[in-house]
């Protein structure tokens, strides 16, 4: 018996267990299969039954674009959506976070949180213009300002002169403060996510070259956030900037993949692969500085490559609307 001879329900059941990266290759194989892949109901089934894959994406060469738009991109399907920004990006430094809420039909409705502040090195943090905006995919609406599900951000409390983790709940559209681990000395931090289930903090003290990776309990529960030390090692190279631009953690092998920039005149982008207790350490020259950056941008500022932990999903952007984001 061949696949065309099988009952449609059985065909759908088989395809729902195919990895997302393989589904992409099958879209052009059969008109019937392609119709199944575009069905929102199938996307939900595929999310729950297909094996979870993990990939590392790296942003290599930053481009200076004379535009005011944000792009949402699904690398798995190659679909994109361009979104017009409300506030002039030239006057502000912006950060974007993608999150979702669960609707009544147990489907995910996605939103984008934008935080922005005025870029003025001469002004104190208290004097800078600061704001938040929300964009909702379900209505393809314009940006709306926030006056006062979740995404997590490292933040600095000006009043208490301390660092905190801010959780933004996309359902209530409110911020909540979460505590960080207790560190014996001041260092630099980077926040990441492990398998979409746990938060991780990279803490690095440059004076001692000591690096620690802390991981929380599962963040998809209502339990109190607890931190535990997962990995500690030494960073052999001191010739790098104080902040790692991004990181990826292999929890089982206790290895961290970091992307950074040398602190010398070359400003080379380097990938560091570091294991626990100095068991493994290597540096890989990833990208030489691009001259166009120094022509168009401030020559005194360093520009980083970034690493992203990406799990392929059957995200469908149809006629500019995000139908389902798993």
Curated annotation (Swiss-Prot):
Annotated signal sequence range: none
CDD domains in alphabetical order: F-box_AtFBW1-like
SUPFAM superfamilies: F-box domain
Protein name: Putative F-box protein At3g22710
InterPro entries: A_thaliana_F-box, F-box-assoc_dom_typ1, F-box-assoc_interact_dom, F-box-like_dom_sf, F-box_dom
NCBIfam families according to UniProt: F_box_assoc_1 (TIGR01640)
Alphabetized PROSITE patterns for the sequence: FBOX
Species name: Arabidopsis thaliana
Domain F-box positions: 1-50
Coiled-coil stretches: none
């Amino acid at each position: 018996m061949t696949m065309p001879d099988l009952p449609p329900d059985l065909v759908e059941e088989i395809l729902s267990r195919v990895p997302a990266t393989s589904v992409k290759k099958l879209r052009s194989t059969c008109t019937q299969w392609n119709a199944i892949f575009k069905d929102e109901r199938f996307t939900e089934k595929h999310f729950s039954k297909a094996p979870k894959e993990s990939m590392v994406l790296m942003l290599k060469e930053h481009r200076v674009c004379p535009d005011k738009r944000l792009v949402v991109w699904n690398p798995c399907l190659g679909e994109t959506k361009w979104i017009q920004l409300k506030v002039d990006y030239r006057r502000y430094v912006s950060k974007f976070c993608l999150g979702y809420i669960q609707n009544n039909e147990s489907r995910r409705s996605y939103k984008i949180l934008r935080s922005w502040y005025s870029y003025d090195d001469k002004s104190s943090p208290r004097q800078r213009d600061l704001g938040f905006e929300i964009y909702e995919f379900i209505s393809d609406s314009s940006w709306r300002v926030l006056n006062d599900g979740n995404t997590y951000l490292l933040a600095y409390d000006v009043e208490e002169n301390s660092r905190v983790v801010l959780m933004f709940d996309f359902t209530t559209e409110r911020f909540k403060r979460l505590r960080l681990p207790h560190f014996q000395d001041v260092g630099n931090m980077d926040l990441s996510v492990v398998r979409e289930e746990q938060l991780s903090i990279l803490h690095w003290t440059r004076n001692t070259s000591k690096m620690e990776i802390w991981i929380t309990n599962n963040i998809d529960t209502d339990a109190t956030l607890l931190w535990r030390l997962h990995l500690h090692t030494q960073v052999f190279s001191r010739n790098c900037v104080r902040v790692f631009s991004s990181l990826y953690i292999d929890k089982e092998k206790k290895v961290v993949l970091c992307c950074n920039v040398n602190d010398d005149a070359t400003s080379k982008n380097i990938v560091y692969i570091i294991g626990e207790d100095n068991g493994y350490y290597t540096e890989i020259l990833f990208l030489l500085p691009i001259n166009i950056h120094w022509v168009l941008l401030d020559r005194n500022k360093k520009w980083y490559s970034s690493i992203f932990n990406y799990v392929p999903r059957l995200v469908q952007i149809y006629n500019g609307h995000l139908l389902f984001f798993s």
